[in-house]
Each structure stands twice: as C-alpha cells, then as structure tokens.
Regions:
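Metal-dependent de-N-acetylase/amidase catalytic core
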Residues: 2-6, 90-91, 95, 100-271
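Active-site rim/loop-helix segments in enzyme catalytic domains that contact anionic ligands
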Residues: 1-118, 145, 249-252
Length: 271
C-alpha cells in the first residue's frame, strides 16, 4: 500500500545531505514523498553571480530542482526566515526567524499539512538539531509537536552516525582544506549504538548526487572548500562509502537491533 511520507527540513540542501537517498528509495517504491522546508536559507554563504539579496529566491529554486530529482510529489515552504548559525540573523522581507517562532504556531501549520496528507511518516531531527544550528533544533521541536497534534504514527529523527562522521572528516581533511573544526563534532549527531535505522541508499545514489548538485550556491562561498563541494568531488567508491547509508532514530524504539527499512514499524503494525 502506498503511504504518504513527509520529510521536514530546516533549509534547502539539508534534504540532500541527510535524507535524499531515503526519499528517492520511498518514491521509487511508489510512496508519496512530500518535502517541507522551514526556510529558504537566505542567510547561507555563497559566492559568484548570485547577489546576496536574491539568495533565498535562488535557493528556493534549487530545492525544487532537488525535489524533482528525488521524485517528490509535493514541496511546501513554511515561510519562516533563516535564523543564521548563531540564531541572531535578521530575516529578510519581514519574515519571522524560524528559531524565534512560537513552536506551537509552526507546529499547527505543519500538523495541518500532515492531516491533509494523511501522513504515515514524518522525519525531523534529533533534539540537538544534529550539530546545534538553531533552526535544526527548532525542526525537532516543531516536528515532534506537529506529529503529536496530527497523530502521525511514525516519527523518525534524521541523523548521522557520529563515529563514521568523525572518520570521514579526518579523511576529507587530508584532501581538502575544510573550514571545519573536527572537535566541534565530537558530540554532534548520534553515536552509532543509539541509532535505530540504518538505511542502504546505494541503489539511489545517482538521484542523491543530482539532489546535491542542484544546490550550486552551497558549493561556493567562505574562505575554503565547502562541505557539499568536497563531497561531490569524491571518487565514486568513496562517494558510495560515505553517502551510501542514511541514519535515523525512532525515539519510541529501544536500541539494539538495527532496522534496514524506514517503514518497518508501519509494516509490522499493519501485519
């Protein structure tokens, strides 16, 4: 039976890095995949021909292209402003910064969409927002409350295997001058033993690469190589190794046995 699966993200390109393979997999299986983005990421870094004042407009177009590459049936924007890395950014055009909005208000809007879609699955982030970005933390708060309001049966927190991330950063920094303090990620995302879902997305890496490539503005800017650009430059075998798995935590599930199917809980309950 085809199900409606809603993926909730903070900014354009978050979907490409965290859940693109799972989205492509579910779409290929015939499920309805919906992408919800809280902001258009207008505070992000960029360089080249894009004027900073138009960055949000361009990134909106980029995430729509990414969604097409993944087979999404619908893309919705909650319409909040990008709060910036420190949560203090002044949103453009009078928008309310997402990190500062009342979570109950934003959750109500998302819950309306979940009900409209009769969503079986909602993905959010872990309580720390992965690496602590204020908008990512807010995605967790808003997503958890929206699922509660709408009665969405399955909530998965998109995350990264912290142990693999630290090894990958060591490897990437041998090749690229990444602007990343490895120590900043010592407590980021989720330790391997706390992860409940490990999803093999290698059959869908072509779609994931197209999704990542759609976010051209996020491959430039800053003083050194951007993370997205570095990942896209990886040779095929390393791309498969680094990006061939996606990880989730199901908060109400005891850790232990690793689940390989994002919809396993729903299938078990239906069976």
């Amino acid at each position: 039976m085809a199900l409606s699966c809603v993926f909730f993200h903070a900014h354009p390109d978050d979907e490409a890095l965290l859940t693109a393979g799972t989205m492509a997999r579910l779409a290929a299986e015939g499920h309805r995949v919906v992408l919800v983005v809280a902001t258009v990421g207008e505070q992000g870094l960029t360089a080249g021909p894009v004027d900073a004042g138009r960055l949000g407009e361009v990134r909106r177009a980029e995430v729509l292209a990414s969604a097409r590459a993944l087979g999404c049936a619908r893309v919705e924007f909650l319409g909040y402003g990008d709060s910036g890395l420190d949560g203090r950014a002044v949103a453009d055009g009078g928008l309310v910064p997402f990190a500062g909005v009342d979570p109950e208000v934003a959750a109500g809007a998302l819950a309306d969409l979940l009900r409209e879609e009769d969503a079986a699955l909602l993905t959010t982030y872990d309580p720390a927002g992965g690496y602590g970005h204020p908008d990512h933390v807010q995605v967790h708060r808003v997503g958890a409350r929206a699922a509660e309001l709408a009665g969405t049966p399955l909530v998965l927190q998109a995350t990264v295997d912290r142990d693999l991330l630290l090894r990958a950063l060591r490897l990437l920094r041998l090749v690229y001058p990444l602007p990343i303090d490895r120590g900043a990620f010592d407590n980021a995302y989720t330790p391997r033993l706390a992860i409940t879902h490990r999803i093999d997305v290698r059959p869908h890496l072509a779609a994931k690469r197209r999704s990542m490539s759609a976010h051209a503005t996020q491959t430039t800017g800053g003083e050194s190589v951007r993370t997205l650009a570095a990942l896209l430059r990886l040779p095929g075998f390393l791309f498969r190794r680094v990006l061939g798995t996606e990880w989730f935590v199901q908060p109400d599930l005891p850790v232990g046995r690793v689940i390989r199917d994002p919809l396993a809980t729903l299938r078990r309950n239906q069976g």
